[in-house]
Amino acid sequence: MREADEQYFETLETQLEAAFDVAERAKERGGDPKPEVEIPTARDMADRVENILGIDGVAERVRELEGQMSREEAALELVEDFVEGTVGDYDSREGKVEGAVRTAVALLTEGVVAAPIEGIDRVELLENDDGTEFINVYYAGPIRSAGGTAQALSVLVADYARALLGIDQYKAREEEIGRYAEEIDLYDKDTGLQYSPKEKETKFIAEHMPIMLDGEATGDEEVSGYRDLERVDSNSPRGGMCLVLAEGIALKAPKIQRYTRNLDEVDWPWLQDLIDGTIGKDEADEGDSAEDANGDDAGEGADDDGGDEADEQAGPPRVEPADKYLRDLIAGRPVFSHPSKSGGFRLRYGRSRNHGFATAGVHPATMHLVDDFLATGTQIKTERPGKAAGVVPVDTIEGPTVRLANGDVRRIDDAEEALAVRNGVEKILDLGEYLVNYGEFVENNHPLAPASYTVEWWEQDLAAAGADVQAMQDSPHIDLADPSAEEAIEWATEYDAPLHPKYTYLWHDVSIEQVCALADAVEDAQVAQADGAYADPEMDGTAGDAHSDDGALVLPRSDAVQQTLEHLLIGHTQDEETITVTDWVPLVRTLGFSRSLERDWTREDLSEHARTYGESESLDAIGVAEDAEREDGQNAIKAINEVAPFQVRERAPTRIGNRMGRPEKSERRDLSPAVHTLSPIGEAGGAQRDVAKATKHADDMSDTPGQVEVEVARRRCPDCGTETHQANCAECSGTTEPVYVCPDCEAEVERDESGRAECGRCETLASPTQYKVLDLQEAYRDALQNVGERETAFEQLKAVKGLTSEEKVPEPMEKGILRAKHDVSAFKDGTVRYDMTDLPVTAVRASELDVSAERLRGLGYTEDIHGDPLTHEDQLVELKVQDIVLSDGAAEHMLQTARFVDDLLEQYYGLERFYEFDDREDLVGELVFGMAPHTSAATVGRVVGFTSAAVGYAHPYFHAAKRRNCFHPDTRLWYEDENDDWEYGTIEELVESRLDDPQEDDFGTLVQELDGDLTVSSLGENGPCRQPVDAVSKHPAPDHLVEVAVGDRTLRVTPDHTMLRAGPDGIEEVPASDLAAGDDLPAYDGGETTTMTARGEASTAATDGAAPTDTVEAVEYVESDVDHVYCLTVADTHRVAVEGTYVGQCDGDEDCVMLLMDGLLNFSKSYLPNQRGGQMDAPLVMSSRIDPSEIDDEAHNMDIMDAYPREFYEATREMKDPTEVEDVMKIAEETLGTDREYTEFRHTHDTANIAAGPDLSAYKTLGSMEDKMDAQLEISRKLRAVVESDVAERIIEYHFLPDLIGNLRAFSRQEVRCLDCGESFRRAPLTGDCRECGGRVNLTVHEGSVNKYIDTAIRVADEFGARDYTKQRLKILERKIESVFENDHNKQSGIADFM
């Protein structure tokens, strides 16, 4: 590590230690669950392992061993330390084995939380039939997240510890061996295994395994043959055991054997038989394997041979257009380009400094000219190389080319100019360049697409042709990026090099016919000087000089010539009779003309190959011909190269289609609804959870106001014996401890070494909670007094209804009072958080961060990226790996949080204020926690500046992980399969049948991306719709699920699963754990399918009229009975209809940040929900240093070059695999483990401001959905690359029609509801009165919600030229709606009706 990097990390750690000292002093004084900071610091992986497991001495020993051996070897070496007692404090033998096994798994998973803590339940000592003892390791489902190698090694570690402790081997009984085989087979059928061993293999392993593999029962199925065994607790498959035996031992036998051979105490000779295939494999299997291997080789060879045929093709090499991103278009989110269509974004290779993975560089002028729908951080669905990307502004690429209302055509390379002219833009002829880095193609395993011919490629071609490019770059008189026309032509002819890209027009976008028509027009053209006189180009040496004002080419105007110039992207002006091109010499020379406008060729002189080149390009990806009469000769590049006196390259051979996805995000993260304190008040606070209201609540007149019964902790002070529910003793201020009581016999139970509290008499788990009546009036009054505040200090104090943590320790209400005062809310762990769309940046300028160069120097930025001293704000400096840039909104929120923290320290803890910020500049240099939600680990970051964009910028290594929320396997849903058939089945069947080649992450999640042919019913902003499924996934199941009862059906999901709840302001998204009885959920009535799913008894109208609602009858936590849960990734809406209810599904979490001192003071594990997954999103450990070798491989694939080599560009012309050019490219992976791993992140493109372009997408600023849709269609009209009728068709087909049909069906099947008592009836009472209370009943679905889009749909179909079939469908539907709502009895008739 460089000295500068070490100094940087030491600076962060010094600040961290100072904050820790203050927080520790505060914790000793307050009423927190623990008297110390609960977020341990980990400088490296060894620290994380120790902190996660809580075993003293592990980190130091791991560091000693890491330098001497591999992690696997270190895990085995640590076994001796546990057995000898030098590491860990275990009295029992089984405790030592358990400590060794957990540490091994933690070490091999680099500190990932789930596997070592939740994947190993316990270790027991049991007896063989001969009286000897053996080790039984009890695995749980989350061991899946450790991966096969760690699973298998955990067994080897247990065996090694057994041998060192002198414990005998496990001697399996015959029935147990048979049980293992039956159980593995049943588990594989029920849940699925990556590798399913043969029956002989399983029995062989079970017979020789020296450790008994056991585990928790999962699933509803039971074995049929080997039941009720003495040493097996359940008749159901044990998921953890099955995973370890099948995916660990059976699959990873070769790896395990490497380590068994080095251990004298352990001998597993039977592994060799397993590896040799003499057990459980037959010749047919081997033949298949050999065939597969040969097939792979043959495929590679075929690929190698195919590259030389490109020149013989009828057209140039092109990637196939792909329209998957267009499927199920969302109303209000524009299409920017149809697939690979001319006029769309032009692919340019490179990486800007604000560019990384899943990002796309777009010119800020383009962002403004598409009516601000694109902003920094806006997600776009894209044709390639990936499926989606976040937009980042890059102004060093080419901007869009537009035609103005007066007919002028110009390229806009300045955002200010774009704003000035956008009201006068008639057509966007070209969207400009689209910057994608090489690593994106590597990550997505996408063949390289032909590159645009750019300056960086041309310079290398010029050098290869013999020019001294370095001398030319050093010359003050030469600008290689922007040469004059005369210079460009001179270089091209002198060096026999391709023409400069500036003067290389898009000849591949025009046909031979168009070129010939343009040539004819040039032949008839004249050159006009500035004074209007026509000049003889041969006589006037200055005419046509791009840098003079005395020459312009005047062409006779015709539609064909105008269209050709527009497609070539040649700037020009025009009047009724002429078209004027100012920079004309390169054009006429490329067309084979002399300066005197003479040529020596005709169409007949062109070769047959040139005249027919590109015949395959007449149709685009959606089958729409741009020019129906064109049949061949679509690409004029061959013809141009035959007539031009120099080489001309294809300027932009690859166009990339895309459309808008999700808008950018920068907002506070609240629980739903937002609360200020994690103190329980039951139902007394009403829907708003209002504490003041709860203090006055009484169930009836005889009750004392404010007396509320809630479930809280049962605790006792160890000093004075006082029993309480608080973390602090009110009598002596000591820290109380939990008291576990058996629910059956009410005896107190002590926890064992593993933390379990099981009653020895009843064999029941004891509980640390109790139901207790709290006096909220007294608690509220005391809390206000303790912090010296009055009720007037805040508008409302909101609390939670109940606690979801294991011990149910309430948070001090004083903290909530101060949060309410400063308008910040508490997350589930007690912290205050802010979410931001995460974007990468590797170099920044002080000027764009709203800080001074002096301030940056104070943070250690002493020199710029070129090594020059940092003296002014415009210098570019390399961003340090843990420095982050906050959005303006985040900065304001941090200021509020800092004021809350200062008040907390002063008024509650009695210490000095810590921050004392006056304005946001004071935030610069302060530490924050950055949370990557899935990892349960916080990374310390430092604020270096601010951006007006609604995103958070950080180094690519300071990256985000994604969380997925899942369904129980038996969850049923409607889906339209790949054959366009509607099916109704379980999500498990849907997912498992499509896991063909899934990717596995560090947490055991299997993800299979789909091509969009699978469609589900969804709920968009304007009602029901159908959406494609982008991916399916399978995840390790949590210990508990949330079961939601709705009518006669139940829905089981993970506790953090996003649910949709109907509220007064429309549909809101909330975690499943936040639902309560009485909540209304949007109901699915079958959509466009022929069968309606079951509906509940209670139904009310959705607030937005888009769907009816069902009422939740009960919500409860239930133990998970499965080993895996499943989910879908639904495009755009991220919502899906399951079990008759619309719910949320997989959605990537943005990175969230929290102020350091807030996390240190207020985070507590005691507040976390008591369920598997409850510890996700929680900073269980914090990393003070990012280790590049430990982060996601995605970041390692990012290229870090300042220029791409010529070999790379040439390879793109052959569409080679990205791995074929890896030898000439440099990616971040190459610097791992060197002293350059934190530096030298070079980029190929700069940009003036990382926040350029609109601050917010127009999607967020426009009002109604109809306004958004009108803007969407208006953009379609302006964009040359968009077929507006196709956009209109898709909106109607995927939004309006499903909405109208669904709402009409809902109207016919609706329930009625009493306006007085709220009772619902499936059929309206004949009297019209409520049968319960006599009140008036009313419809729940009204006419307005049924026909609200019919007029709009018909208007769009007529205005934008939808197909007759679509118009007819709408007319038929309009008649159906009229027939439902028209009163036939009162219909007015004319005399003609009777004639």
Swiss-Prot record:
GO terms for molecular function: DNA binding; DNA-directed DNA polymerase activity; single-stranded DNA 3'-5' DNA exonuclease activity. Gene3D superfamilies: Hedgehog/Intein (Hint) domain (2.170.16.10). Residues 283-312 have a biased composition (Acidic residues). Keywords: Autocatalytic cleavage, DNA replication, DNA-binding, DNA-directed DNA polymerase, Exonuclease, Hydrolase, Multifunctional enzyme, Nuclease, Nucleotidyltransferase, Protein splicing, Transferase. This protein undergoes a protein self splicing that involves a post-translational excision of the intervening region (intein) followed by peptide ligation. Its EC number is 2.7.7.7, 3.1.11.1. Belongs to the archaeal DNA polymerase II family. Heterodimer of a large subunit and a small subunit. This is DNA polymerase II large subunit.
